[in-house]
């Protein structure tokens, strides 16, 4: 009986030690000036879901998109994904990420409202687009 209790105690300590070695998820905030409308949010979320499963080893835990501020907060595991990989994923989806511009081919495929303001995209006067219209 003493050996059994000792074995359980050892397993608990070993389990605690192994859990302590796992990297914790961290947050990063990335500005994207052409991420202002709900359509853009849907396009980016679809892309990130596919990208997370295929190329990022499921390193993205969650993301929150603030359309009014034009930014995305991403929680990720740093042992699987780097901030540069996240910015590259945004660029490949057609969106600017901080100071890095989107890939031109991908930028051409996003909806017109998701284009940069200098290209005529984004919210128009008296036509807010940060809220999905009621259908």
What are these regions (language model features)?
Residues 1-25:
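Bacterial Sec-dependent N-terminal signal peptides
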Residues 22-34:
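Short glycine-/aliphatic-rich beta-strand segments at the starts of folded cytosolic domains
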Residues 43-46, 120, 135:
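Secreted/processed peptides and extracellular or luminal domains of membrane proteins
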Residues 32-42:
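Short, surface-exposed ligand-recognition loops at beta-strand->loop->(often short) alpha-helix junctions
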Residues 28, 67-74, 105-111:
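Surface-exposed aromatic
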Residues 94-106:
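Conserved short beta-strand edge segments in small beta-sheet-based binding/regulatory domains
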Residues 107-133:
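Short, low-order "capping/linker" segments at domain edges
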Residues 41-88:
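N-terminal, post-signal-peptide region of Sec/Tat-exported proteins
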């Amino acid at each position: 009986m003493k050996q059994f209790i000792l074995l359980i105690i050892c397993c608990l300590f070993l389990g605690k030690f192994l859990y302590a070695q796992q990297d914790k998820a961290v947050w990063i905030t990335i500005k994207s000036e052409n991420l202002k409308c709900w359509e853009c949010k849907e396009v980016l979320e679809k892309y990130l879901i596919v990208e997370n499963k295929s190329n990022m080893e499921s390193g993205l835990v969650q993301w929150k998109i603030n359309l009014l501020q034009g930014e995305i907060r991403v929680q990720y595991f740093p042992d699987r994904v780097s901030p540069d990989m996240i910015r590259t994923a945004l660029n490949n989806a057609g969106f600017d990420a901080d100071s890095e511009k989107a890939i031109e081919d991908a930028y051409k495929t996003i909806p017109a409202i998701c284009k940069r303001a200098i290209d005529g995209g984004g919210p128009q006067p008296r036509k807010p687009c940060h809220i999905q219209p009621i259908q």
